[in-house]
Amino acid sequence: MKTYIFEIRLFHRKSILRKIEIFGSASLYKFAGVIVGAYNFDFDHAFGFFSEISGNRYFDSERKYELFADMKDEGIEPTGAESVEKTKISDVWKNVGDKMLFLFDYGDNWLFTVELIGFWEKNNKIKYPKIVKKVGRAPKQYNL
């Protein structure tokens, strides 16, 4: 089974990064939880993945996947995004160098660039997902 290796950088602090290895069959929901956990944040806010990375136009992205798409039954208005619970990593990232913007917490706007940097084969001795590398100290999620 193939694993995907990602480099995730804080958008406005590119020197702070995490490398994560995860199965391509994992949902975007699970991936979001792993990213947030790798930065020691609480996984307690809405989030989305967007194909538009530059500027503040990510909501106009051609491809977008948001938690709100999975909350239609709870009275949440449709955003035109696809599901994060039903979409697999392998459906979004196809080639090394593919990038998406990850927005966590629509109030505080934590932005991350998520770039596929490689593929690897599953190692039965390793538990996945795996944080492969941490560079830089993660900021505090809340400035209390």
Please place each PLM-identified region on the residue numbering.
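Short linear regulatory motifs enriched in tryptophan with gly/pro/ser
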Residues: 1-144
